[in-house]
Amino acid sequence: MKTDSAQVHRVERVDDIPVLLATLQRLKVAAILDRHFPSGHRWKGTLTFGEVACVWIAFITSQGDHRLCQLQPWAQDNLHTLRACLGKTVRPLDFHDDRLADMLDHLALDETWQDCEVDLNQHTVRVYHLDPHLFRVDTTTANSYVEVLSELGFFQFGHSKDRDDQPQIKVALATLDPLGMPVTTLVVPGNYADDPLYVPEIEKVQQAFGKGGKTFVCDCKAASLGTRAYLASTKDYYLCPLPQTQVSAEQRRDLLQPVWQGRQTLQQVYRPAADGETEELVAEGFSLDVPLQAEVAGQQVTWTERRWLVRSLAYALGQHQQLDRRLQKAQEHAARPKTSEVSTSRGQENLKNLKSLGRFRGFMIVGPMNPVFALRDFK
């Protein structure tokens, strides 16, 4: 009796490709891209612009490789998987790097891309039943070893927390909280200032989800009066720490005088605990309302800003321990025999200054920490 042995013609690792493509299909990414970036009569093959882009996104996500020249050989190795997921004939030539470069040129059209981004954001919110009312806006930098070839390029030298000696690009990003889903992205040269980037990002969020009733959580670089006034003019809310350029150290001391004199009641903040556990006290503070006015697009805008002065207990404890170490060191230094009256008086003056700092524990401005937060009043 003759039996036919099974023959293996091709072996492919499916990995996460079907999951990625199914997610993109659920979000209708291909259909949205095709609506805003039609393929045109010179487009060859059965796959559309959007379908090629979806395979490209799946490749970048799965392989962690953004190089154009690597997509075609990867598609060659996964032809059967791609055909099964897309339900169409797939050719390796559909993912040639020249075609991908042309697609990037189309995606770089700002107005068309912004319309596509709005369409995609609105559809994503509908599909996943998200609440688009709380957003977080922030900026960051990305360094590289590339050379700066022109003042018109994106990679430029600028202020960096990591490497000032390397060119960088600057990225502004708006995300939907608490999910952390990216909503809008803006890439600018690395020598741009951060402050002017917030309003354009906020405007793009408002273009997708409308104005009014949204809350934007930002860092202190978004605390410029112009940014806050713009949000007040659109009936939106904001929450951000105020830097010393907005509230000086002397103003903060004046605000804290009632606390030190025992005339200001502090509101306590507790961390929610599980059933049967005791809530943990993590902070305390107080608020005050400040009327503000500014000009936005030639119109006078007035609003009430609620400012919170907050004392984090963990942060205050760290300051307390650091101050005690410095006091002990200063006392030891002051107790040593001095060679002159000048050094003795200088050491005693330093010790006096350190002791006076004890009153500011927890409310001091050290590094990135800021005790004063501002938000547009919800009343």
Where are these regions (language model features)?
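Anion-binding and metal-coordination hotspots
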Residues: M1-L24, D34-K379
